[in-house]
């Protein structure tokens, strides 16, 4: 029976995302657990086009975009020390973390 912990990190800023990934990887490696990653997942780009003028000049438009960067970390066969180390990691405010526990029975 092998358990896995999957950690998905999302952020608009890839610098803070990479920093958070390094902190998690170093915390897990201190507990001597095996970790796969960071695996860069495809970034999602949302583009918005709006008119510059509210009345005329339809051809004058502005374009904005939001880039969402993602990383995946997989911890194989975690022990309680890994969970304790992950709970103590302090991450940046702009990084969203989703943790999934997967049990392989």
UniProtKB/Swiss-Prot annotation:
Q: Which UniProt keywords apply?
A: Ribonucleoprotein, Ribosomal protein
* Summary of the function given for this chain in its UniProt record: Involved in the binding of tRNA to the ribosomes.
Task: Write out the similarity annotation.
Answer: Belongs to the universal ribosomal protein uS10 family.
Q: Give me the gene this protein comes from.
A: rpsJ
Give TM regions: none
Asked whether the UniProt record includes Ribosomal protein among its keywords, one would answer yes
SUPFAM superfamilies recorded for this chain?
Ribosomal protein S10 (SSF54999)
What quaternary arrangement does the UniProt entry report?
Part of the 30S ribosomal subunit.
* Official protein name in the record: Small ribosomal subunit protein uS10
Q: Which GO terms describe its cellular component?
A: ribonucleoprotein complex; ribosome
Taxonomic superkingdom: Bacteria
The UniProt entry, under InterPro entries, shows: Ribosomal_uS10 (IPR001848), Ribosomal_uS10_dom (IPR027486), Ribosomal_uS10_dom_sf (IPR036838)
């Amino acid at each position: 029976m092998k358990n896995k912990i999957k950690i998905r990190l999302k952020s608009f800023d890839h610098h803070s995302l990479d920093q958070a990934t390094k902190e998690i990887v170093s915390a897990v490696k201190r507990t001597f657990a095996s970790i796969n990653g960071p695996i860069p997942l495809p970034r999602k780009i949302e583009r918005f086009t709006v008119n510059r003028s509210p009345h005329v000049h339809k051809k004058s438009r502005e374009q904005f975009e939001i880039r969402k960067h993602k990383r995946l970390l997989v911890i194989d066969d975690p022990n309680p020390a890994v969970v304790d180390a992950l709970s103590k990691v302090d991450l940046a405010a702009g990084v969203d973390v989703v943790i999934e526990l997967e049990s392989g029975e």
